[in-house]
Amino acid sequence: ARLTRRKNIALALHILHHLRQIDDQDYRLIVTGPPGPHNPANPGYLEELLALRKTLQLETAVHFLYELNDPPLIPDDTTLSNLYQLGDGLLFPSMQEGFGIPILEAGIVSLPIFCADIPPFRETGLNDVQFFDPDQDSPAQIAAMIHNYFKDHARQRLKARVRHHYRWEVIVRQQLVPLLEEK
């Protein structure tokens, strides 16, 4: 996917900002696509998003893969698959799409999907995704919907908790280092 204004990534940043205010979870957003090459305004849109990330104080919470490397990182299929496996959910706020392949990709790995209520997403997601209206629902309302989903789904809470509290760096610091210091 390409980073274009119709993808509505600014809304995703605002949603994340509100989500992080609801509770103490370390919610993060990874934006995988580079700026679309066919519209000269797209690099400017990325600059707007980077400025918004700073304004919302999300510098450590929002990651644009495109900016992580020189030359820019454009994830291959294996990397995207790994991101789906590791993710807690797919946030897809696009205002317009032709089909919505990420819904299929996230669905195949049982990832919860939170997406704009537009015809292609409705057709693909049916009743198995969480819809929001990007024109009517505020970022705070969408954040509350996402928060409530995770609060009510134990399997998803467990996955997030295990990943947050049992990363190798945490296990080493909390379990192995104390054992080694005893000797």
Predicted regions and their residues:
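Short hydrophobic beta-strand element within catalytic cores of glycosyltransferases
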Residues: 103, 108-115
